[in-house]
Amino acid sequence: MQINRREFLRISGAGAMTLFLSGCGLSALLGSEENKAAGTIPEKGSISGGKAMKIVVITSSPHPKNESTSYYLADRFTEGAKSAGHEVFTFDAANSDTHPCRGCDSCHMDGPCVFKDDIEQTLMPKMLEADMLVLVTPLYYYGMSAQLKTIVDRFYSRTSKLNHKKSVLMATAYNSADWTMEALVAHYNTLVRYMDWQDAGQVLAIGCGSRSLVESSAFG
């Protein structure tokens, strides 16, 4: 079914979602647990377990915020989550002081990392206390952006401490072929399995090559 921006905001606040955007038109198969009143904290049985969550949203587009398609979706998700009573922290991986993991193993997978950058000092404490992690990326060569991959690789320093969280994948792509997101979703699903996360949903926007296309779509 087609749903509009208000529905997206409501769903993002209410819990699990499986959304697929084609040509910036939104199609979704939604269970009854997602059909909660707008602006309410999810009822018991939804993805939140009936309580307000701490959510970390990690954006990773190198484009300016006002031009980024993926950032637009992240903003809409954040708006819906906050309106439902959840606490949201957003980290901009593309415009922060970050360093890729160098494989030194000084952390022994239990921290701290040798890099005292924004990942270690700002993002990691928020992720450790979060109930849900939201990974937001433009699709680059059929995978996540290098900026997001840098964050994911740095999970190594706290692997076990980041286990057992809920997660969401949000991605935008110019290509509109039905196989466009297959490689990214496969990577994400593998990450979910390895980290023992609970997948709370995916927003996969194909055929959305510009900010204006997204803004003039069901989300506008």
What do these predicted regions represent?
Residues 24-136, 142-158:
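N-terminal beta1-alpha1-beta2 submodule of the flavodoxin-like/Rossmannoid cofactor-binding fold
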Residues 62-65, 140-142, 174-178, 209-210:
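Short histidine/acidic/glycine/proline-rich micro-motifs that form metal-
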Residues 1-16:
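N-terminal secretory signal peptides and thylakoid transit peptides that target proteins
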Residues 56-58, 89-91, 168-171, 200-203:
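Hydrophobic/aromatic beta-strand patches that form the interior of the parallel beta-sheet core
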Residues 163-201:
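Short, glycine-/small-residue-rich phosphate/pyrophosphate-handling segment
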Residues 149-156, 182-187, 217:
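Charged helix-capping and loop-helix junction motifs
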